[in-house]
Amino acid sequence: MKSEWTIKKLSEIADFNPRESLRKGTVAKKVGMDKLQPSCRDIPFYELEAYTGGTKFRNGDTIMARITPCLENGKTAKVNILEEGEIGFGSTEYIVFRAKEGVDEDFLYYLVCSSIIREPAIKSMVGSSGRQRVQTDVVENLDIAVPSYEEQHLIGRILRNLDDKIKINSKINENLLHQLHVLYLRLFGDSVMDIPLGDVVATTSGGTPSRKHDEYYSDSSICWVKSKELLGNYIHETEEHINNLAIKQSSAKILPEHS
């Protein structure tokens, strides 16, 4: 039986950019923005560097990019590369979320990844074009429906298990691609000519319809492909859609099927 969910501010269930002590010059694990993979929970790489500044975090914290286009691309991760009590650091362009007492850290991570947080965060962005940043106070004051801790834990566990399965499947796919490459070399050798890409394919580019115009994204039927959706080999559906008005009033382009 589903319990009653309580409406709370996000700042009531998570600490934002919690204070941590890390002396300058201390060698620690650094997670640069380039180390995060779009729509990927785990942090695949880090560097050991002397701390000179940046956001600080511990295992279990969620780090979310607050700058465009990294946030739109899905750069949000759950820290799992540190030892007990160890502090890591990273880009100043992260927002760090730490689950408060009585809040499940996996539930918080998947909440931050959801449209419940992402969409208002993206809409709150301010700044010059190409360097827009999330207004942290807007995110802190979002109203969130929060279940009991038991339900949080159940939700977090289910989604964590699915993520674990995705990770296993990704490793299987990497192995299959490696086998395909080995088989290709065995069949055709390495005597492949290098020619300019433009000699065999036509390339084009476009631009993103302004996020300030909600009407571009309403009553929409045209698939809008974001960079995070280029991770697979095929695109069958997209998270967002745009309409003909967006095409007419921006540099976005419609590409033919099988592009």
What residue spans do the PLM features occupy?
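DNA target-recognition domains and sequence-specific DNA-contacting regions of bacterial/archaeal
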Residues: 6-144, 198-259
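Non-catalytic DNA-recognition/assembly elements of restriction-modification systems
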Residues: 1-21, 145-208, 219, 228
